[in-house]
Amino acid sequence: MLELDLQRATDAAAPDDAAFRRWCELALRQRTADSEMTIRLVDEAEGRELNHTYRHKDYATNVLSFPADVPDDLLDIPLLGDLVICVPVVEREAREQGKALEAHWAHLVIHGCLHLLGYDHIEDDEAEEMEALERELLAELGHPDPYADDETDSITH
């Protein structure tokens, strides 16, 4: 079971709670243990501040992933971690890349959840594995390959 804490720290329009839950559950289905995670939706100012604080980059990025570093046996529900998603960046990227907004939201939530599970895209072989899983999960939702028109990974973090 997934315990999802969705924090809407901005008034900007974003998908409904059910969509976030559906995307998270899809990305996390390989995990057999119960999970607890938070998704915080933020404006550009908070996104920039967090990206600067944790990544030393002075701009707002689309999604930041903060995997929990807590042994599973310390909590009743294993804490998976937190995602921070900057709503204006998601909207701008979808528009600039000519992607359907819902598909881009689904991609970024799935991408962030995979980071919480330990996937990464620093090395080429890791990126290929992660992107293949993203493509597979998004296809199950009826969304196109998010990397089809890209020479490189479009995720900016």
UniProtKB/Swiss-Prot annotation:
Gene3D superfamilies: Metalloproteases ('zincins'), catalytic domain. InterPro entries: MetalPrtase_cat_dom_sf_prd (IPR023091), YbeY (IPR002036), YbeY_CS (IPR020549). Binds 1 zinc ion. It is found in: Cytoplasm. Its EC number is 3.1.-.-. GO terms for cellular component: cytoplasm. The keyword Cytoplasm applies. Keywords: Cytoplasm, Endonuclease, Hydrolase, Metal-binding, Nuclease, Ribosome biogenesis, rRNA processing, Zinc. Its cofactor is Zn(2+). Pfam families: YbeY. Its main location: cytoplasm. GO terms for biological process: rRNA processing. GO terms for molecular function: metalloendopeptidase activity; RNA endonuclease activity; zinc ion binding. Zn(2+) binds at residues 111, 115, 121. Belongs to the endoribonuclease YbeY family. Single strand-specific metallo-endoribonuclease involved in late-stage 70S ribosome quality control and in maturation of the 3' terminus of the 16S rRNA. NCBIfam families: rRNA maturation RNase YbeY. This is Endoribonuclease YbeY. It comes from Pseudomonas entomophila (strain L48). The gene is ybeY.
